[in-house]
Amino acid sequence: MSSMWSEYTIGGVKIYFPYKAYPSQLAMMNSILRGLNSKQHCLLESPTGSGKSLALLCSALAWQQSLSGKPADEGVSEKAEVQLSCCCACHSKDFTNNDMNQGTSRHFNYPSTPPSERNGTSSTCQDSPEKTTLAAKLSAKKQASIYRDENDDFQVEKKRIRPLETTQQIRKRHCFGTEVHNLDAKVDSGKTVKLNSPLEKINSFSPQKPPGHCSRCCCSTKQGNSQESSNTIKKDHTGKSKIPKIYFGTRTHKQIAQITRELRRTAYSGVPMTILSSRDHTCVHPEVVGNFNRNEKCMELLDGKNGKSCYFYHGVHKISDQHTLQTFQGMCKAWDIEELVSLGKKLKACPYYTARELIQDADIIFCPYNYLLDAQIRESMDLNLKEQVVILDEAHNIEDCARESASYSVTEVQLRFARDELDSMVNNNIRKKDHEPLRAVCCSLINWLEANAEYLVERDYESACKIWSGNEMLLTLHKMGITTATFPILQGHFSAVLQKEEKISPIYGKEEAREVPVISASTQIMLKGLFMVLDYLFRQNSRFADDYKIAIQQTYSWTNQIDISDKNGLLVLPKNKKRSRQKTAVHVLNFWCLNPAVAFSDINGKVQTIVLTSGTLSPMKSFSSELGVTFTIQLEANHIIKNSQVWVGTIGSGPKGRNLCATFQNTETFEFQDEVGALLLSVCQTVSQGILCFLPSYKLLEKLKERWLSTGLWHNLELVKTVIVEPQGGEKTNFDELLQVYYDAIKYKGEKDGALLVAVCRGKVSEGLDFSDDNARAVITIGIPFPNVKDLQVELKRQYNDHHSKLRGLLPGRQWYEIQAYRALNQALGRCIRHRNDWGALILVDDRFRNNPSRYISGLSKWVRQQIQHHSTFESALESLAEFSKKHQKVLNVSIKDRTNIQDNESTLEVTSLKYSTSPYLLEAASHLSPENFVEDEAKICVQELQCPKIITKNSPLPSSIISRKEKNDPVFLEEAGKAEKIVISRSTSPTFNKQTKRVSWSSFNSLGQYFTGKIPKATPELGSSENSASSPPRFKTEKMESKTVLPFTDKCESSNLTVNTSFGSCPQSETIISSLKIDATLTRKNHSEHPLCSEEALDPDIELSLVSEEDKQSTSNRDFETEAEDESIYFTPELYDPEDTDEEKNDLAETDRGNRLANNSDCILAKDLFEIRTIKEVDSAREVKAEDCIDTKLNGILHIEESKIDDIDGNVKTTWINELELGKTHEIEIKNFKPSPSKNKGMFPGFK
């Protein structure tokens, strides 16, 4: 292994790490390997920013590869060296024209291989060894399809007339899951052929002529490899899998993208992998993408009801194995789901089914962790977790997710729709014996709903409910005829109606095959959910019945009144008539699981090892009892930062001395709301850059916003910072755009000092988003985010825990309730301090923290508990906070340039250039650098050279000037301090987000019991009471880029920064010193007076800044940066930039756009893609430009300034200057015409200017 990796041997397993591991990472890897080697479960907490993901990936993959005895960097090369022959029919030895002329049917199969070898490593095929892969079937099917329009998104399936066959000659064909439509088969007239019987083999076809060239088969994509070769590597003589797969689950798809980026930087980046995702993220079909319910639409297309099927689905075989994906498609390193989607679009192959097919040879499978907990999703994805390793990252919400996975809710409207559809099937004599019992189930539930709707108890305004225990519901189900004995029969009927069949019947003298209709996708989904929860209720002699509560809830919704035609069938509507709305009662039947161990029972006892990790697992004592899993290995790791890097304090009173206790009663008062607003304003004036403020609920957020708008405090906040509010609900794209406005306001701050983002605990902002460096210099939490005590599910859960706390060891209801609050609070606090060199303040506003610390502090994360300080008065807290912020801000302004010579502590891959972005993202570029090399020298600025930098500045002193910060790929430009004036760009007001059933009559139905006559006992089985069941506790089984060294001055407002262009050439490394860079005192004082938001500490006129570029004395592997742009995507920043315009293009644009004025667009938000300055003719030498107000982002950015033209290295600099745009100055400026995007204005409040 190359020396570029740090090597550790833990528990006999050799681990290659991309840098010197932190102590917390070593502790995590040690715990993980102990659990994997001993097949025990792990519960590990490591603070956010401590490198938890890398420790998980490296240790688990190193352990997995140690079982096969191959090094980490040889896994892919071994597979690539295996030469696999094509197994298609056109290459088989026994394929002859005589066979085709005789019209005999042929199997396009792999060479004869024992099933155990062919499918041994697939976790999805361990229980069914004869299962054939989807790619093999589709490849064979592609050969049989001769007339296909390659440019059409659909293929019309051709029907073939076959000779009548005897029963022994019937060729049953396997359907690739319940969602897939296959080619038709012909049998004796009037007979029915099942297309997805479990006993079927792969498809058989009888083409009328030999298949074409290999372009029709998998050889066309150089995919002709059989799965046996890679499988036999991992098989012993018994055919059983020796090496477990790793299922890596996390909370969201965005977090999966972050994990795969981490994997790409390790020695294990070439490991075979796949990412399971929903159709919302992977479907590329144009008809499905625009559909609201993509699952149902996809299933309808695959059914091919209109004679058409999804063409993307039939191209899955092109990229459905790891060898093809890595060797021929160039995805040899860890990839993201977006890359697979792009490849699927290019090759017309469905990414959704491709990802599922890649499971077979994958060593690690990434997915949202509800894919592993939800029984329906596991069945749909065909996941078998037996003897596998399950790692669940960000698992602080795993209890809630497990409860939701075992719960189900269905509306009365859905039940009626399903009943009517099933009734239509019965009336048309379509598989009547199977549809009738299912119809009876729906009818029984509807009648029971209607009968109990009159006895609902009112809880809140326009809401009522009634609750039953699980045992009471079992008695009700038994009266309906649904019992432990009849339920398996119902499951059999349901499986039968999902099978696709064809009926052969003579039409006009010819025999035609017609597909037997099946119930709609929506009815299938509803019945699957209902049968899933009934299965839990009846499982193991109703073991989990006491863990359920069944509730009927009634709410009201406003719907448009239906227009009814007259007796003649005419419908007359007045031209200006407003459609009337009516209030309609909505009934919902809920099956609520109160015990997360129910869902975990499918996993616990089957998997080899479960690893739960998060940065906020505290308090950890509830996981074992709630999940029913014994975590023998537990760890609470320390943070990697120093105590001086974080300020943690509690504040119990506001600026006016009023007590701040955020209980429900207090938050309703104007005094509390005004005091919180004054506190927030003071913190915004004290801490620069980005501030996050988290509130307990959206309801409180709306109250505070309304109050602050009426009192004018909101306006005062907007004078200091750009104020943005997290929207409740809404589209994801709208939220991403709003978040981009927040990042831009910090990155390109103008007259305002950063931004304030007001959000809600448990909302989108508090979970899974990274606010490193300037994006979150302070996190303020108001109150303690307890769940809504009046919520029915919260109330039932508290009662459940109180009832079972002694018998099952569960936490009492009150403790469980408080733990939910602290987990949400810890998640919000975790948005700050995202890497080792980050710093920030955590401000907990509530008097309860100080008055009762033993109760309210114990639930916080360990690293927060260790540093928390209680402040008796607001003044003392603000003074301490100001000192902390000033100290770090001053160090930041001088030391940003020092970060450039620090070893990248998380990436040592060799590259040829550095990429810098502006202030908030400079720190991200050096976010994980080793602190050993950190030099805090305010007099000298060290710039580390990679290869051969050429500094275009000479060693002679420069004139007093302001050298502005620039974006990554933009040229450097220099600006003299006395020749320009500050440009003020105001932000405009942005609007807030604006958000945006059919009842069928039924006559009668027959009892469900008649469908089981003679099959089941009619006596009612004895069901234990809730007390009896409680007494027996259940058993829980490189692209080149210019490098810019940014050297900001020490002024707090960062009104000017120094940018030095560093280009890499072939000359030897050298040292260039910029010395004696002095700032004119008079000019500095003038600049200070022009900045209303500046602190009193102006830039010291005697400070001398020097630029030193030294030879790197460390190995290249210890100082290289990774050039991939994905590290910045978590900030939603642009990753691509437009190329520079030529001189001719600039002149053309100047002539076209002449005459437009920037002042006409001064109300636009300071965001991206607004306008671009091309030429500025006149220069006022008495004014200074504030450079950071006009930073160029050509792709989405604000002002694009004409590049400085540097002609020679002797310092002869020709610069295009920026002029004053205010007060009727006679400057001539040419800008691009533009129209601000409305999406950029969403989420902003009135008065935002």
Curated annotation (Swiss-Prot):
Residues 102-131, 1018-1042, 1108-1127 are annotated as: Disordered. InterPro entries: ATP-dep_Helicase_C (IPR006555), DinG/Rad3-like (IPR045028), Helic_SF1/SF2_ATP-bd_DinG/Rad3 (IPR014013), Helicase-like_DEXD_c2 (IPR006554), Helicase_ATP-bd (IPR014001), P-loop_NTPase (IPR027417), RAD3-like_helicase_DEAD (IPR010614), Rad3/Chl1-like (IPR013020). This is Fanconi anemia group J protein. The gene is BRIP1. ATP binds at A185, K186, V187, D188, S189, G190, K191, T192. GO terms for molecular function: 4 iron, 4 sulfur cluster binding; 5'-3' DNA helicase activity; ATP binding; ATP hydrolysis activity; catalytic activity, acting on a nucleic acid; DNA binding; DNA helicase activity; metal ion binding. It comes from Homo sapiens (Human). 4Fe-4S iron-sulfur-binding is required for helicase activity. Changing S1001A: Does not affect the interaction with BRCA1. It is linked to Breast cancer: A common malignancy originating from breast epithelial tissue. Breast neoplasms can be distinguished by their histologic pattern. Invasive ductal carcinoma is by far the most common type. Breast cancer is etiologically and genetically heterogeneous. Important genetic factors have been indicated by familial occurrence and bilateral involvement. Mutations at more than one locus can be involved in different families or even in the same case. Fanconi anemia complementation group J: A disorder affecting all bone marrow elements and resulting in anemia, leukopenia and thrombopenia. It is associated with cardiac, renal and limb malformations, dermal pigmentary changes, and a predisposition to the development of malignancies. At the cellular level it is associated with hypersensitivity to DNA-damaging agents, chromosomal instability (increased chromosome breakage) and defective DNA repair. Phosphorylated. Phosphorylation is necessary for interaction with BRCA1, and is cell-cycle regulated. Acetylation at Lys-1249 facilitates DNA end processing required for repair and checkpoint signaling. [4Fe-4S] cluster binds at C283, C298, C310, C350. Changing S1007A: Does not affect the interaction with BRCA1. Changing A349P: In FANCJ; destabilizes iron-sulfur-binding and abolishes helicase activity.
